[in-house]
Structure formats: C-alpha cells, structure tokens
Regions:
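A glycine-rich phosphate-binding loop feature that marks nucleotide/adenosyl-phosphate handling sites
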Residues: 338-341, 412-416
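Conserved SAM/AdoMet-binding glycine-rich loop
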Residues: 106-111, 118-120, 223-349, 357
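Anionic-ligand binding region
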Residues: 378-381
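Proteins enriched for Cys/Gly/acidic motifs involved in redox and nucleic-acid/cofactor modification
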Residues: 1-239, 315-326, 350, 354-358, ...
Length: 425
C-alpha cells in the first residue's frame, strides 16, 4: 500500500526524467476481465479525458468489454478532478450510488485521477469507503493491470498512489473517443504553483515529451484520417523548458506539427507568462493552427494576481492580448476567471469587470473561488460572504454573456456573407 503525501508532492528536483517504452501487460492479467463489462466515468479537464482513453484501452487489453450503464457493469472506475469542491462532491455522490449497487451484487469499484493524489481523499476512502476496491493516481496509470490484479486476487482494498511523478511512459495503448479529433499530450505536470491551485501537487513537476514522440503520434493520426489535434499540457507554452540543453520550444513544436499535414491544430492550456512573440508568429503564419487561444486571466486586479502568484500584471496581460488581436485575424479569445478570492474587494472585482470589457472575450469559464487543502491560498483569511461571491459571479456572467452574444453575432454575419458568396460563384 502506498498513499499520497502533499509535502513530497510539492518537492522539485533536477533528476532526469526517463522515457519508458514497450509497455506490456503480463499474459496472466490479460484474461481477468473476460466476459466482464467496465465503465469509466471521467470528471474534469482534457488531460483526464486523454488519461481515460489510455485506461479504457488497458482494460480492454485485459479482456474487459466496454459497458454503457453502471447498473450492469462489473467494474466502474472514476477518473477524478480535484480543482474544485464541486468535483469532489460529485465523485463522493457517485461512490454512494455504487455502494448501493455493490450491496446487491458483485462490483469492482476503483478511483483514480487527481483526487487520488490528495491525502484527505485517500484517508477518507480508507476509513469511510472501504467498499472501494482499488485506488491509483495520475503518475502510475501504466500500473493499472498490476493494481487491479492484486485487488482481485487479495480481495482487499488496494491503494497505490505515487506522491512523486515517475517516468514518461510511451506506448501505452489508447482507445480514441473520436474518429476525427484527437488529444495529444505534449507534457505533464506544472511548476507554476499558483497559490490557489492543487494541480502542481496532483500532476507533479513539469515533464515534456520528446518532439520525436509527439510528431510521430500526430503523423500516425494524419495517416489514420484524423482532421484535428489538440496539444495538451497544464502549461503548454512552457514546453521544453524542463529538458536541460533542449533548444526546442512550443513555437518550434507548433511549427513542426503544422507541417505534418493535419488540417486543424489547437493547444491548451496557455499561461500568459510564457506566451512568446514566436508563438504568435507561428499561429499567424500557419492556417492550420486555429486562431483559438485560451488565455486564463483569473483576475483583473494586480493585487489579487499577486496574491494568486500568477507572475504577471494586468498591464502585461493586456499588452499580450492587444498583440494577439493585432497579429491574428478573427482570433477567438477565451479565458478563466475566479471571483471571491480571499479578501477580494469591490475595487478588485471592478478591475476584473473592466478587463473583461477591454478584452471582449468570446467566452469565459467563471468560478467562485474554491479552497484546496494544502495550497497557500487555503490558509488565507477569507472575509467575503457567500452571498457577495454569488452576486459577483452573476454580475460577471452577465457581462461575459453580453460579449459572447456579440461574438456569436459576428460569426453569424461572416457565415451569411460566405454563404452568399458561395451561392453566387
């Protein structure tokens, strides 16, 4: 049994990250799922969706058949998100449903993903949810066959969560959810340590895949008829910075992916601090790199940005946005915004509203601040009432929706003009 430790998870070192290839499942584990149905329920971000594609493929190599409904599944695995309390509540609510099912028939229940990397979650699983059969984290998906095998053979709760990130494991099988659009991991982890964010603890230090492996994956997708790839990472703009002597960055990678012949390229998520002029040039000069930029601002207040540890100012963010809009025609700009961060004043919130007005985002993901155990922000005094936070969120959403409607109307007019042109010629 191995349980998570957030103190260890925070530590960073300069140890070289090894690349492990030729993933294999032991022959005796390839039969344990024969004639059994599995269901994987995924919560959270695109990284989790991509992880679930690996998990599903591993289970099918072990003989399991994909099911649709948890009511008739033999194995249910929850791939979880730790970014907000709401995600926690959904998962524990689902565990309650699964417990009820398990009381009437055999059922294997597993939990993985970012929640599994949290001490408080695993402690609760061990003490109050003993019906959960196995738990593993974000760093050891490739160990799923062995973990599941032990859980079945030993008939007791199997917990194997690595606090520290491991090697990069290539060649894990994948079951793509879409025949035309694909997720492609380019890196794992994050070293930014924003004060409110649990991700650097749950996903580990930044580790970039080698360009050769990324480009090979994209080329295979092109050959298989895929039309669109989304390059994934917690902070894709920092790609390559973790590899010593690696003179190759996100702009270089975007340029090379564009040359593979894939028709459409997206990337998420970008941190404003690492967005370079070279990246802007590559997006501008390559038509198959879509002019879609997700650029989380989180707050428009310099005071709050500093408390968040975001490492940029309102002014530098706006300078970047203006540069993007000047260089990339028809850019679609989206963002993330948190309201109700500890001790956010009316003035701070008004700064956020004003940056929305200046940027005119096409869309935004907006949230009330959710404290995460183990992060610095969770220890900050919070004197803002829930009523105030909810009122601010509604006011922000009204403004965001106003600019979203403007964006939709512009798009509609362009489509009508294009349709009229095509009809004439």
């Amino acid at each position: 049994m191995k349980t998570p430790n957030l103190v260890d998870a925070r530590k960073r070192n300069c140890d070289r990250v090894n690349i492990i290839r030729n993933f294999k499942i032991d022959s005796d584990l390839k039969r344990i799922g024969k004639n059994k149905k599995y269901v994987v329920k995924t919560y959270g971000c695109q990284m989790n969706e991509r992880d679930s594609e690996n998990i599903c493929a591993i289970l099918e190599e072990m003989g399991f058949i994909r099911g649709i409904d948890i009511e008739d599944a033999d194995l249910v695995l929850l791939n979880t998100c730790a970014i907000r309390e709401n995600a926690h509540n959904k998962v524990f609510g689902m565990l309650g449903r699964l417990k009820h099912i398990k009381e009437s028939r055999p059922l294997l229940i597993g939990l993985c993903g970012c929640m599994a990397q949290e001490e408080v979650v695993v402690d609760e699983i061990m003490s109050r949810h003993k019906y959960v059969d196995f738990v593993f984290g974000t760093h050891n998906i490739h160990e799923l066959p062995n973990i599941l095998g032990r859980a079945i053979d030993n008939n007791k709760q199997e917990i194997e969560v690595w606090s520290k990130e491991g090697d990069i494991v290539e060649d894990i099988p994948i079951k793509r959810e879409n025949k035309y659009k694909a997720w492609v991991n380019i890196m794992y982890g994050c070293d930014k340590f924003c004060t409110y964010c649990i991700v650097p603890y749950t996903r580990g230090k930044q580790r970039s895949r080698l360009k050769e492996d990324i480009l090979r994956e994209v080329e295979e997708l092109v050959n298989d008829g895929y039309k669109e790839v989304t390059l994934l990472g917690q902070n894709v703009n920092a790609y390559g910075k973790d590899i010593e002597g690696y003179n190759y960055n996100m702009a270089n990678l975007l340029s090379d992916v564009a040359k593979t012949g894939i028709e459409r390229i997206k990337f998420v998520t970008s941190h404003p601090w690492d967005f370079t002029d070279d990246m802007i040039s590559v997006i501008r000069d390559n038509p198959n790199v879509l002019p879609y930029i997700h650029l989380p601002v989180q707050s428009g207040s310099n005071r709050i940005l500093k408390l968040m540890g975001r490492k940029y100012t309102r002014e530098s963010y706006l300078e970047l946005v203006h540069k993007l809009k000047e260089n990339i025609p028809n850019i679609c700009l989206t963002t993330d915004i948190i309201v109700g961060f500890p001790n956010e004043t009316d003035e701070d919130f008004n700064d956020t509203l004003s940056i929305v007005r200046e940027c005119e985002y096409d869309s935004a993901y907006t949230f009330i601040y959710s404290p995460r155990v183990g992060t610095p922000a969770a220890k900050m005094e919070d004197n803002i009432s829930l009523e105030t936070k909810e009122k601010r969120l509604q006011e922000l959403n009204d403004l965001v929706n106003y600019y979203s409607r403007k964006s939709n109307n512009r798009t509609q007019r362009r489509l009508k003009q294009l349709s009229k042109f095509n009809h004439q010629y």
